[in-house]
């Protein structure tokens, strides 16, 4: 695994650049930080129109993107209830391949009856995974499980900060099989 140092804004900007097939996109965040020093792919430049200092963020093109959505047919026509987040669309458009786990696989006739609900057309693979987003929410199916997130946070904190991995190991053994 290669580490590519950045912050969230740079990550999304790089994905957007790849989704739009651009050589880079400008980003204001990170100007004046050490990010361009620790990540040589980030180039500081002067905006030729306004003269402002910006960072050129190159396209980030994942080999594979893994997403979660409400439903899809067997042909990869994905439907997010309430629409996808913009990051899902950037990831889908930037990646070479997209795998989407869904709460339900629906008949193609249902997709064709509601074509405006299709947010991603032609995902490379669909995996039926009821409760696949748990402990987070899946719109239209279940809400975020804050009690479960608290269990995980306590276990991870004990392992990371207190040097006690037993609680995290027990959590992973019980919930992540």
Regions of interest found by a model, annotated:
Residues 1-177:
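Conserved alpha/beta enzyme-core scaffold
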């Amino acid at each position: 695994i290669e580490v590519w140092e950045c912050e969230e804004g740079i990550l999304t900007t790089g994905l957007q650049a790849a989704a739009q097939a651009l050589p880079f996109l400008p980003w204001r965040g990170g100007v004046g930080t050490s990010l361009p020093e620790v990540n040589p792919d980030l180039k500081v430049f002067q905006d030729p129109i306004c003269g402002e200092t910006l960072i050129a963020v190159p396209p980030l093109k994942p080999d594979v993107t893994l997403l979660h959505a409400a439903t899809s047919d067997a042909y990869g026509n994905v439907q997010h209830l309430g629409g996808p987040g913009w990051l899902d669309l950037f990831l889908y458009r930037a990646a070479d391949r997209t795998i989407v786990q869904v709460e339900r696989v629906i008949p193609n006739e249902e997709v064709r009856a509601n074509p405006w609900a299709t947010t991603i057309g032609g995902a490379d693979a669909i995996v039926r995974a009821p409760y696949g987003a748990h402990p987070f929410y899946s719109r239209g199916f279940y809400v975020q499980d804050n009690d479960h997130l608290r269990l995980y946070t306590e276990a991870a904190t004990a392992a990371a900060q207190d040097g006690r991995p037993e609680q995290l190991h027990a959590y992973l053994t019980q919930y992540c099989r």
